[in-house]
């Protein structure tokens, strides 16, 4: 039987605030166990939480960026369950009245536009961490307790694993552009649970869904969804029924396995958080946050095409990440050459980032220095070939391109008499090639250029070399 996959995603986005959601403890990653804690984190009697204003700001901005309705009045709620790494015995979250609802995200899959509706975006706190790899015992690290999260819940509008991955990548791009999260899936800043069901094609009624967890990359999201859909199809084709449960994705065995029976909302016994006042928003607050939103990729891409006259492909690559787009614009301010700047950022800069596995914020060559390098090429001070060598030195030096060129004697030679002398030597040393050129094998022009550049150690101005060589060959 032919089945249709129906997918809804629940994404937990860890916010990059300096302090936790309901207390002043640091959210710094990697601190020694149980050092970023306080009586509020540890649920000591008599402690009271206070909502971090930055968390509310991040929630509203993400809601605005995803076309949500922002609630004028919303409340926090207690989500009750027992787990060793949850000292309170409940998690502060939102239930009936979330801060954001009824939004949507638009994205492309293989060039085709798609739109996925959002049920809600709500604020909640993270639980602690259980550590199982120290001897035979289990230990608890409460550092993560209270770290702020936003949960983004989609409608079951997604119809393929590839579409789910594209949706997730778009959401990641949005939170990174907003600056509310680093969106790092491998480190758990963006955690995705997929609710997956299948139904016969053409049928409206939804099938029984399973929730799949433990997917820490876009590729694992795709593979887990594909596997789970195939597993459910095999169960139904064999005459069985799909069990509503939570399953864990095993990236080593490339399969899902049962984790626990799927909980329902009533299992958590939600009720309003009595220790926190309701969240009230107004038009002036929303207007303020709306004005602080960044220029998002689609608009920035269109502006790059019109303002800088660069190809659509270039603009698309440069605007995937906000920091890359910023870097490009800062470079153009110095170089005053958008296309050359685009070529360098898309080529040598992105290549180096990939090779060194670093983010642009850690890239050692600042836009100012790259812009200066491009300017030196434009002025004819150095050739593109020499510029590549200068760029490599800039990666491990704080010197300016001009300083490197002067120190290493890399300035381009444009002196016509010096170049004429070398070209004469090349032609004199290549009688056979010269005769073949005269006979019509004009592709040997490149050979003469190469020999000239080799003798001048790449310092000759290519434009001047071409002009003089053309003149000499025509009169030979």
Swiss-Prot record:
One Gene Ontology term of the molecular function aspect: ATP binding
EC class of the enzyme, as a word: ligase
Transmembrane segments: none
InterPro entries per the UniProt record, alphabetical: Asn/Gln-tRNA_amidoTrfase_suB/E (IPR017959), Asn/Gln-tRNA_Trfase_suB/E_cat (IPR006075), Asn/Gln_amidotransferase (IPR018027), Asn/Gln_tRNA_amidoTrase-B-like (IPR003789), GatB (IPR004413), GatB_C_1 (IPR042114), GatB_Yqey_C_2 (IPR023168), Gln_synth/guanido_kin_cat_dom (IPR014746)
SUPFAM superfamilies with a match to the protein in the record: GatB/YqeY motif, Glutamine synthetase/guanido kinase
Highest taxon listed in the record's lineage: Bacteria
EC number: 6.3.5.-
Catalyzed reactions: L-glutamyl-tRNA(Gln) + L-glutamine + ATP + H2O = L-glutaminyl-tRNA(Gln) + L-glutamate + ADP + phosphate + H(+); L-aspartyl-tRNA(Asn) + L-glutamine + ATP + H2O = L-asparaginyl-tRNA(Asn) + L-glutamate + ADP + phosphate + 2 H(+)
GO BP terms in the entry: glutaminyl-tRNAGln biosynthesis via transamidation; translation
Family matches, as Gene3D superfamilies: 1.10.10.410, GatB domain, N-terminal subdomain (1.10.150.380)
Keyword annotations from UniProtKB, A to Z: ATP-binding, Ligase, Nucleotide-binding, Protein biosynthesis
Protein purpose: Allows the formation of correctly charged Asn-tRNA(Asn) or Gln-tRNA(Gln) through the transamidation of misacylated Asp-tRNA(Asn) or Glu-tRNA(Gln) in organisms which lack either or both of asparaginyl-tRNA or glutaminyl-tRNA synthetases. The reaction takes place in the presence of glutamine and ATP through an activated phospho-Asp-tRNA(Asn) or phospho-Glu-tRNA(Gln).
UniProt subunit comment: Heterotrimer of A, B and C subunits.
Recorded family membership: Belongs to the GatB/GatE family. GatB subfamily.
Stored PANTHER family: GLUTAMYL-TRNA GLN AMIDOTRANSFERASE SUBUNIT B MITOCHONDRIAL AND PROKARYOTIC PET112-RELATED (PTHR11659), GLUTAMYL-TRNA(GLN) AMIDOTRANSFERASE SUBUNIT B, MITOCHONDRIAL (PTHR11659:SF0)
Name under which the protein is recorded: Aspartyl/glutamyl-tRNA(Asn/Gln) amidotransferase subunit B
């Amino acid at each position: 039987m032919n089945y249709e996959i129906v997918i809804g995603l629940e994404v937990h986005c860890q916010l990059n605030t300096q302090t936790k959601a309901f207390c002043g403890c640091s959210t710094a990653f990697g601190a020694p166990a149980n050092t970023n804690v306080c009586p509020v984190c540890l649920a000591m009697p008599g402690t009271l939480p206070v909502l971090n204003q930055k968390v509310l700001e991040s929630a509203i901005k993400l809601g605005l960026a995803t076309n949500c309705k922002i609630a004028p009045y919303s409340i926090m709620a207690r989500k009750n369950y027992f787990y060793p790494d949850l000292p309170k015995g409940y998690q502060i979250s939102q239930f009936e009245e979330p801060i954001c609802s009824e939004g949507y995200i638009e994205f492309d899959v293989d060039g085709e536009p798609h739109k996925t509706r959002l049920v809600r975006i709500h604020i909640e706190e993270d639980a602690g961490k259980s550590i199982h790899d120290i001897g035979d015992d289990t230990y608890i690290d409460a550092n993560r307790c209270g770290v702020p999260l936003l949960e983004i819940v989609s409608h079951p509008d997604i119809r393929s694993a590839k579409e789910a991955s594209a949706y997730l990548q778009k959401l990641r791009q949005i939170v990174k552009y907003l600056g509310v999260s680093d969106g790092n899936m491998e480190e758990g800043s963006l955690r995705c649970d997929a609710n997956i069901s299948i139904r016969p094609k053409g049928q409206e009624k939804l099938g029984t869904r399973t929730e799949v967890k433990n997917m820490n990359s876009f590729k694992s999201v795709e593979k887990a969804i594909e596997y789970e859909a195939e597993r459910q199809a095999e169960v139904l084709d064999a005459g069985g029924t799909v069990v509503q449960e939570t399953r864990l994705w095993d990236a080593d065995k490339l399969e899902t396995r049962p984790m626990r029976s799927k909980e329902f909302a009533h299992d958590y016994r939600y009720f309003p958080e009595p220790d926190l006042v309701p969240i009230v928003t107004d038009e002036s607050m929303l207007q303020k946050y709306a004005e602080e939103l960044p220029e998002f990729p689609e608009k920035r891409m269109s502006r790059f095409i019109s303002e800088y006259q660069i190809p659509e492909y270039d603009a698309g690559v440069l605007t995937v990440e906000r920091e890359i787009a910023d870097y490009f614009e800062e470079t153009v301010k110095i170089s005053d050459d958008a296309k050359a700047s685009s070529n360098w950022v898309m080529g040598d800069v992105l290549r180096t980032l990939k090779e060194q596995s670093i983010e642009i914020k850690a890239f050692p060559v600042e836009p100012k220095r790259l812009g200066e390098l491009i300017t030196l090429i434009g002025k004819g001070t150095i050739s593109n070939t020499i510029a590549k060598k200068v760029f490599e030195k800039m990666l491990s030096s704080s010197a300016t391109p001009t300083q490197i060129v002067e120190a290493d004697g890399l300035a381009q030679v444009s002196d016509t008499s010096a170049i004429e002398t070398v070209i004469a030597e090349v032609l004199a040393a290549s009688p056979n090639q010269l005769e073949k050129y005269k006979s019509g094998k004009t592709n040997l022009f490149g050979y003469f250029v190469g020999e000239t550049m080799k003798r001048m150690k790449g310092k000759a101005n290519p434009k001047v070399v071409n002009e003089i060589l053309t003149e000499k060959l025509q009169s030979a």
